[in-house]
Amino acid sequence: MAKKVIANIKLQIKAGKATPSPPIGPALGQHGVNIMEFCKAYNALTQSQEGMVIPVVITVYADRSFSFVTKTPPAAVLLKQAAKIAKGAGDPKRDKVGTVSAAQVREIADLKYKDLNAVNIEGAIKIIEGTARSMGIEISG
């Protein structure tokens, strides 16, 4: 018989930097999960992606055990990194804060494809292009 799931917790944590402080501690503590055990496992798994924000889905079971799945970094974070900017535009229709090439967009779409709700890679590229436009990033080429 399968374990009974009592909660699914979604967090975005910097890779290799999970600590018991908020937001991780309170989110896991209210379900009785061993916070340090999660932090050590998460940091070990995401050590190679240092500095990136990695979304994680934590499944908490009735016996207070847990499992977690990491996702690919958010498209906005990857686009900011590709355009070498700190943050998106406050008014994306008027202000353009950076530029990415079509090749960079395709590379990001390839990386994000498994987490996106897209039928094919062209659909994934359109999703990434839309995210870039909403951030005030222009796509060249």
UniProtKB/Swiss-Prot annotation:
GO cellular component terms listed in the entry, alphabetical order: cytosolic large ribosomal subunit
GO MF assignments: large ribosomal subunit rRNA binding; structural constituent of ribosome
One record GO biological process: translation
Pfam annotation, one family: Ribosomal_L11
Keywords linked to the UniProt accession: Methylation, Ribonucleoprotein, Ribosomal protein, RNA-binding, rRNA-binding
Keyword Ribosomal protein: yes
Modifications after synthesis and translation: One or more lysine residues are methylated.
SUPFAM superfamilies: Ribosomal L11/L12e N-terminal domain (SSF54747), Ribosomal protein L11, C-terminal domain (SSF46906)
Domain of life: Bacteria
Subunit structure as annotated in this protein's UniProt entry: Part of the ribosomal stalk of the 50S ribosomal subunit. Interacts with L10 and the large rRNA to form the base of the stalk. L10 forms an elongated spine to which L12 dimers bind in a sequential fashion forming a multimeric L10(L12)X complex.
Reported function: Forms part of the ribosomal stalk which helps the ribosome interact with GTP-bound translation factors.
Family listed: Belongs to the universal ribosomal protein uL11 family.
Protein name, UniProt field: Large ribosomal subunit protein uL11
